[in-house]
Structure formats: structure tokens, C-alpha cells
Amino acid sequence: QIGVWKALREAGMKIKGVAGTSVGALNGALICMDDLGKAEEIWGNMTYSTVFNVDDSMIGKLKKFGVRSMKVTDAAAEFRRLFSDRGLDIAPLKKLLEETVDEERIRRSPRDFCAASFSVTDRKEEDFDVKAAPPGTMKDIMMASAYFPGFKQEKLGGKTYLDGGSVNNVPVDLLTDRGYKDIIVIRLYGIGVDRRRFMDIPEDVTVHEIAPRRNLGGILEFDSARTRKNMKLGYFDGLRFLYGLCGRKYYLDMPYSEAYYFGRIMSELDMFKEWLRPYVKEHEFAKLTGYRVYTEKIFPFLARKLRLQPEWDYRDLYGAVLEVFAKKMQMEVYEVYTPDDIVGKIHELFSDRLTIG
């Protein structure tokens, strides 16, 4: 979410309102405060002990080697400590919210800010207009929205709450109910209910979705290496959304028509022959002449091998082949490439092979 926000912010996109649940509520507060630096600092240095009262070194051993890496007595003592008093001690998370959430900055923000939670006391979803909250209660709202099962239960404002994602992990309705017409949803694919499946989005409302194509890790995986990687992924997924970048794994700047890329394919057939080499016997290569054999046989074959959608076009095919070569050449994923960038690398590779030969 923070990575996407960075991309939107750099592009000058005006954000008028934010709705979040669970971790999205904390990120929503940072967006309302317009404090990208603080957001990157928090997530870039995130550890388990930032959220729970735990020993990071012990968690590291558990992740790397499993429970067997610990003495039985040490493991038993740690689990008793973690889950004593009916749940995980989240005092560090409360401290983080206390140090981060600036109520006055949020109230002065021109952006609307809503959060969702589930009231166990009332047995129903409870939505909050955060900026209208009584003084001193914003941090409690953040906690109420993020009260994950397993956390030590404490009453907030006389009520017991559960993570809002359990009933509404994509709170689009909080914005449509306030008249918003152009909405960007940043998906994390956490547990819970996507309420959009059960709501009728008004016809005059446009919902754009930015969703990761890679695993973001576990829902309670608070590891700085993981969160930095996820921020980078979010940033480039934001660029994909903003500028219509192509690619499944890579980020390709391919803004021209299908006809343009068909022309490039036909002028770069040697590159396609190289891709085909594992699938075509050497003596068959001599028969790969003329355009019809490519358009009628070779290209459909490639599309199947690359698992393109049935409605693929030559822009899709060209981009998919470029991605195969980019992966083979171990090119950095988190960069924006033009076809010329990748084709240039391919030519360098072929040239080196010829020189060596």
C-alpha cells in the first residue's frame, strides 16, 4: 500500500479520501498525515518486536530452522510467555501508534479518512469517520480496526473489537456512501471478506484495482526484508497502473499498437528462432522461412507455450517473449524496460557468443 501511494504521489495524483481496515487503517493515517517518509521508515524497519512483545532472534531461529532448533524447555517457556494472559502482548504496537498517529495533523488534512472494524460486543461491523472521532480516541480506532484474533483482548471504549478485515477487507462502501466516484483499491489478499461481492456498486462509480502478482508473505510476517520488498513491489505495481505497463513479472513500457509490435516481431525473427531452439530439431530450422509458417503455426505454438490468454494479440506475444529472455539473462525485475532495452541485451549476448565461438 505504501509503495503504491509513493507512485501515485510522485505522479501528482490528488487523493481526496482514504478508507482502510486492519493495516490499511494505519496506512490510511499516514496518508492523511501525508508523511511518506515516516511510512517508509516504519515499514522499512519493521520487525516482530515492533508489533509484539517477542524476541526477534528467537523468531528468526523459528523461521529458519523450526521449533526443533530450540531446546524444548526454551520453546515451551517462550510460547507460555507469548500466549499468557489470553493472547499476544501487543504493547509495542500500541507504542508505535502512540508515537506515529498525530491527531491534529489528521484533523487538519483535506482528506476524508474512514476505518472499519467488527464489534464483538455488538456483533456487527462498525465503521468510523476517524476525523470526527472524540479527542484522544484515534489510536483506539486504529487498534480496533487491527485487532487480529490471537491478540490479547482489551476493551476499547467499553467494547471488544476484532480485525475489520474479518467482515470487510476492501471497504469500498465507506467511500461510495460518501459520494466518491473514482476509487483505487489496493489489494493485499489477506484473510476476511471482500464485501464488494455482495454490494451493488453504483453505475457512476469506477473502481480501479491494483493487485500484487507475487506472494506478499504471511499476514503476521513482520520482517523488514519482506516489507521493503513489498514496498518496492507496490511502487512498481503503481507504475504499472499509472502508465499502462505490460508484463507479468517484468514492467515493460510498450505503448504502441499491435501492428507496431507485429512489425517488430517480423523484423526480429532470429530472436524468436533462438527461443524456439529447445523445441525444434536443428534440421527443421531450415524450413522456418516465409511469414505464413510463423503466423499460422509458430506464433500460435509460442502463445500456448507462454500460456497467453485465448484472445492474445501480437503485443502480448512480443512482450511475453521479451520477458522470457529477460529472465534468462537474470535482468533486474524492479526496473521499467522498453523493448529496446531487452533486445539490446539479447544482441549483446548473441554477439558475445559469436566472439567466443
Where are these regions (language model features)?
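Patatin-like phospholipase
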Residues: 1-21, 29-357
